[in-house]
């Protein structure tokens, strides 16, 4: 009897007013209504927006913590972009831990030390680290090196001629210009007679007859 009541509660029977045929219309999915269909899409959009806001804020907080020298929030380190060195190690495949070489510590200066400081702070260099001169070259090596050396060819230098360059450093005036022109004409054409021309003497004005 209880089972029958539960079945009647889940299966809703309604009779169509227009068609009095007594057919039972079952509605097994109560969430298939139009109002709930729009509501779940709106709820999904709100969920996605809240998730994006959470991820963005977490990445921003991790970036601020990294600038301050702190570790990122636990479980959210994958949100923080890798640094330049970290990405370089990942690209080159050198993820293994490389330890820096540390020489062996001894109470006295060994052959790997340059020296030591005493109690007064004075530095005492190690005699084993002094500069050793290279061995002298043998006569055969010295003669072979002298033969291999050759004197380089002398560089060709162009000698400027007087006709191309004028070394007269006087201020350019009319007299200097005329003298320079006359000198050039004498050098290039010696047969041409030089005529005397005085620039300062201006020609007399012609008289007009009345």
Curated annotation (Swiss-Prot):
Residues annotated with Phosphoserine modification: 161
UniProt keyword list: Membrane, Phosphoprotein, Transmembrane, Transmembrane helix
Membrane topology: Single-pass membrane protein
Name assigned to this protein: Protein RCR2
Residues modified as Phosphothreonine: 191
TM region(s), chain numbering: 41-61
UniProt family annotation: To yeast YBR005W.
Major localization class: membrane
Localization in the cell: Membrane
Protein's GO biological process: protein localization to vacuole; vesicle-mediated transport
Listed PANTHER family: PROTEIN RCR1-RELATED (PTHR28187:SF1)
A GO MF label: protein-macromolecule adaptor activity
InterPro entries referenced in this protein's UniProt entry, alphabetically: Chitin_synth_reg_RCR (IPR020999)
Compositionally biased tracts (Polar residues): 175-199
Chain spans, region Disordered: 125-149, 175-210
Additional notes on this entry: Present with 1230 molecules/cell in log phase SD medium.
Top-level taxon: Eukaryota
GO CC field: cytoplasm; fungal-type vacuole; fungal-type vacuole membrane; intracellular membrane-bounded organelle; vesicle
Gene field: RCR2
Pfam families linked: RCR (PF12273)
